[in-house]
Amino acid sequence: MALIRLELHEHPASPQHEMRQKSVLDSGGTVVGTVANLYVDEGSRQLRFVDVLTSEFLGLERKHHLVPVEAVSDQDPGSITLGVDQETVQSGPEFPNPHVAPDEDYQRTIREHYGYG
């Protein structure tokens, strides 16, 4: 499916999917990172992936990891909670260029990593 990255002034189709700048917690409540970007279906504007900016190696190394929206298990005003642990997020493929929407092969790889393939 064709995806686009939402610009800061754009919003997903469902207001409850506005997650940018929220803290990201894993299934055990550990802070994994922050929501950096949202990727939506180009036609419907439905949220498909959340770009999680993680801090690894004592917070010195920051990486982008895409997470399928299906992995978001809860949300409150300041954070989202994933239904997976920190290791699952950090062991996923790094998203090398968060300024460009992921192609279909990369989307498939990410979905398979999280068990949604």
Predicted segments, located by residue:
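Peripheral interaction segments used for macromolecular assembly
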Residues: 1-117
